[in-house]
């Protein structure tokens, strides 16, 4: 059985210095910058803006650059320009490409994996088997430092704001030694229950701490307080 550790907190989708200040003030551990992704998102930044924000980041926070690169060359280009503490690969980059990033940088790598949302366990046996197989391959290859499970729905592999079946995430967590970050529809009202079920290394929130597409101080504070309450029972 895995030893339960206190769950860390990542607030994703930073767009301004004010967003970063709120995350730092209330005690987040890391913040995410969605950079140069080829999809529409209100949180998408160009690489110049991401680099500028990260250069001003409070020292108490780790910076996570979230990217969807088509190959390792593009990932390395963005890492060199933006200079985050951690890179999160939110695309189907094969292990051989991840290995190139690993060999050419010493930056920790998070690999996003998509868990089907809106289905019970009986309907997702095949997707979950594929996920488990992929997690095992990633762990055996040693090309990533952690995995992030996000909710996929209607062709989108994450950032949907939907919750998936946390029992599926717990099953994956129990099958790997890789640190597991839980995302997908997390908000102050449900994060304690998510932590109780999954026991993740970290939780990741974006839209769940926003009002009308903007980060909200009350929601960020409440989210972090709820995580701390969950941690108090560990």
UniProtKB/Swiss-Prot annotation:
Keywords: Amino-acid biosynthesis, Aromatic amino acid biosynthesis, Isomerase, Tryptophan biosynthesis. Its EC number is 5.3.1.24. Gene3D superfamilies: Aldolase class I. It comes from the Archaea. GO terms for molecular function: phosphoribosylanthranilate isomerase activity. CDD domains: PRAI. GO terms for biological process: L-tryptophan biosynthetic process. The keyword Nucleotidyltransferase does not apply. It catalyses: N-(5-phospho-beta-D-ribosyl)anthranilate = 1-(2-carboxyphenylamino)-1-deoxy-D-ribulose 5-phosphate. Pathway: Amino-acid biosynthesis; L-tryptophan biosynthesis; L-tryptophan from chorismate: step 3/5. PANTHER family: N-(5'-PHOSPHORIBOSYL)ANTHRANILATE ISOMERASE. Belongs to the TrpF family. This is N-(5'-phosphoribosyl)anthranilate isomerase 1. It comes from Methanosarcina mazei (strain ATCC BAA-159 / DSM 3647 / Goe1 / Go1 / JCM 11833 / OCM 88) (Methanosarcina frisia).
């Amino acid at each position: 059985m895995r030893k339960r550790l206190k769950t860390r907190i990542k607030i994703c989708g930073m767009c301004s210095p004010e967003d970063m200040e709120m995350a730092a003030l209330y005690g987040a551990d890391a913040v995410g910058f969605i950079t140069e992704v080829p999809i529409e998102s209100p949180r998408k930044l160009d690489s110049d803006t991401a680099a500028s924000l990260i250069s001003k980041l409070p020292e108490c926070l780790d910076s996570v650059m979230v990217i969807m690169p088509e190959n390792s060359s593009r990932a390395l280009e963005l890492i060199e320009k933006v200079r985050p503490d951690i890179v999160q690969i939110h695309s189907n980059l094969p292990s051989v490409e991840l290995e190139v990033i690993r060999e050419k940088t010493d930056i920790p790598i998070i690999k996003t994996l998509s868990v089907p949302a809106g289905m019970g366990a009986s309907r997702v046996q095949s997707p979950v088997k594929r996920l488990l197989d992929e997690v095992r391959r990633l762990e055996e290859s040693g090309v990533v430092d952690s995995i992030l499970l996000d909710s996929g729905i209607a062709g989108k592999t994450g950032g949907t704001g939907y919750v998936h079946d946390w029992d599926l995430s717990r099953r994956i967590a129990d099958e790997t030694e890789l640190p597991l970050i839980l995302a997908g529809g997390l908000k102050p009202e449900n994060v304690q229950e998510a932590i109780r079920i999954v026991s993740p290394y970290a939780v990741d929130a974006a839209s769940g701490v926003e009002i009308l597409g903007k980060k909200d101080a009350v929601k960020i504070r409440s989210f972090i307080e709820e995580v701390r309450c969950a941690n108090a029972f560990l």
